[in-house]
């Protein structure tokens, strides 16, 4: 299956107080905890400008800024940039602040890829998880439309797509895997969730 991992690391991290992607947790940057659990495929990192040097120093080669015309427009801008610049059928889009996700969950999610849907999104504890989801390349026109219409919420995009919702039971996932980190005290000291 033709899939590229897309890690979104372009946010301002206002509540966290510093860039989350580079925050050291248990001896390595937060983004590395996420990256090691993604599909065994190429990973493209969509970076905040202030982190470009950091990622390059960590040996990351596929690190891009959002395309200039959509820079600052949130996750949709990152998805747009990845789809415009890296050809693939599917994109596993994830945030850099979900360090408890498991590769098994990513693999289970990818097993639902089908030509009959545009996106495969987990539903965990009654909430959609659009920032750990698979999007087909054919979503690009809908993403472009959302950006042009200044509809920047993920729910705006989801309403335009044929979506396969996958429950946490179908993924054999735990709800804690999908916790995103907004403040330092969201990270347990011992790494256990």
Swiss-Prot record:
Query: Which cofactor does this sequence's record say it needs?
Result: Mg(2+)
Q: Which organism is it from?
A: Bacillus pumilus (strain SAFR-032)
Query: What EC number(s) does the entry state?
Result: 2.7.7.77
Its top-level enzyme class, in one word, is transferase
Function, as annotated:
Transfers a GMP moiety from GTP to Mo-molybdopterin (Mo-MPT) cofactor (Moco or molybdenum cofactor) to form Mo-molybdopterin guanine dinucleotide (Mo-MGD) cofactor.
Which InterPro entries does this entry report, sorted A to Z? MobA-like_NTP_Trfase, Molybde_CF_guanTrfase, Nucleotide-diphossugar_trans
**Coiled-coil residue windows:** none
What name is this protein filed under?
A: Probable molybdenum cofactor guanylyltransferase
**Pfam families linked to this entry:** NTP_transf_3
GO biological process terms, semicolon-separated: Mo-molybdopterin cofactor biosynthetic process
Secretion signal: which residues? Answer: none
> Which parts of the sequence bind GTP?
8-10, 20, 66, 97
So where does Mg(2+) get bound? 97
The reaction(s) this protein catalyses: Mo-molybdopterin + GTP + H(+) = Mo-molybdopterin guanine dinucleotide + diphosphate
Q: Give me the Gene Ontology terms describing cellular component.
A: cytoplasm
Membership in a protein family: Belongs to the MobA family.
Q: Name one GO molecular function term.
A: molybdenum cofactor guanylyltransferase activity
Gene3D superfamilies per UniProt: Spore Coat Polysaccharide Biosynthesis Protein SpsA, Chain A
In terms of domain of life, where is this protein from?
Bacteria
């Amino acid at each position: 299956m033709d899939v590229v991992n897309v890690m979104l690391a372009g946010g301002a991290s206002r509540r966290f107080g510093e860039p989350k992607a580079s925050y050291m947790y248990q001896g390595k940057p937060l983004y590395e905890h996420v990256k090691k659990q993604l599909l065994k495929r190429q990973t493209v990192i969509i970076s905040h400008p202030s982190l470009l040097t950091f990622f390059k120093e960590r040996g990351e080669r596929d690190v891009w800024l959002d395309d200039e015309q959509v820079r600052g427009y949130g996750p949709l801008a990152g998805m747009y940039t990845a789809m415009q610049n890296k050809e693939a059928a599917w994109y596993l889009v994830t945030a850099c602040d979900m360090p408890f996700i498991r590769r098994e969950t990513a693999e289970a999610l990818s097993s639902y890829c089908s030509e009959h849907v545009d996106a495969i999104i987990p539903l965990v504890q009654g909430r959609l998880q659009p920032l750990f989801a698979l999007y087909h390349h054919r979503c690009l026109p809908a993403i472009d439309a959302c950006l042009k219409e200044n509809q920047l919420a993920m729910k705006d995009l989801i309403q335009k797509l044929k979506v396969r919702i996958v429950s946490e039971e179908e993924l054999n996932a735990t709800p804690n895997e999908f916790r995103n980190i907004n403040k330092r005290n969201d990270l347990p000291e011992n790494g256990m969730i």
